[in-house]
Regions:
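Gly-rich Lys/Arg/Thr-decorated short loops/hinges at beta-loop-alpha junctions or inter-strand turns
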Residues: 1, 156-163
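N-terminal glycine-rich dinucleotide-binding loop that anchors FAD/FMN and/or NAD(P) in oxidoreductases
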Residues: 74-75, 79-80, 160-179
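Flavin-dependent oxidoreductase catalytic cores
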Residues: 1-125, 129-145, 153
């Protein structure tokens, strides 16, 4: 097997090589283009003509609008866990997103954040990623939400993802989503 280091844009160097080779065609690159700076830089530096993205739109259904408006602070970072690409030979048609629980369920009413008729004060016990996403969902519906976390700091176990360099996607998720 070929070792693969998880980078923001692991295939950009190959696209850049193709671009420099003098091919008379537009060169596109896919893989890891989630952050606006990476997209802008790759095109501005002439490394590619087109940037392709899929997971950025899965974790952020409004990615195009966020990009156009320059609202990178509103991005939900993709963990690149590949759960959106199917779950193996026994369940190839089931696809989910670790950071966008609505993905794949958009047409099912109970998963959508419709405004509530009666606002409630709701306590969410636990301030890990699941508790925080639940709080966001409930707040989006119009409820008043309070998160109770025993540790005094939000994030749960993901707070400890800083110390392993190859877990940078979790660190990005923590740093950008848990603020």
């Amino acid at each position: 097997p070929i070792p693969f280091e998880l980078q923001h844009t692991p295939f950009l160097k190959y696209a850049e090589h193709a671009k420099k080779s003098g091919l008379n065609m537009k060169i596109a690159c896919v893989g890891g283009f989630h952050y606006f700076d990476d997209v802008d830089q790759a095109v501005a530096e002439g490394k590619v003509d087109i940037v392709s993205a899929a997971r950025a739109f899965i974790s952020n259904p409004d990615y195009g609008q966020l990009l156009q408006e320059g609202r990178d602070e509103d991005l939900v970072p993709c963990l690149r866990c590949n759960k959106c690409h199917g779950r193996g030979k026994h369940d190839i048609m089931t696809t989910v997103c670790s950071v966008n629980p609505k993905f794949g369920f958009e047409a099912v009413d109970r998963y959508l954040a419709y405004p509530v008729d009666k606002v409630k004060d709701i306590a969410v016990i636990g301030g890990g990623p699941g508790g925080m996403r639940t709080a966001i969902y409930l707040a989006d519906r119009g409820h008043k939400v309070t998160i109770y976390e025993a540790e005094g700091e939000l994030g749960g176990a993901i707070r400890h993802s800083d110390y392993i360099p190859f877990k940078w996607t979790l660190k990005d998720y923590k740093d950008l989503s848990l603020i």
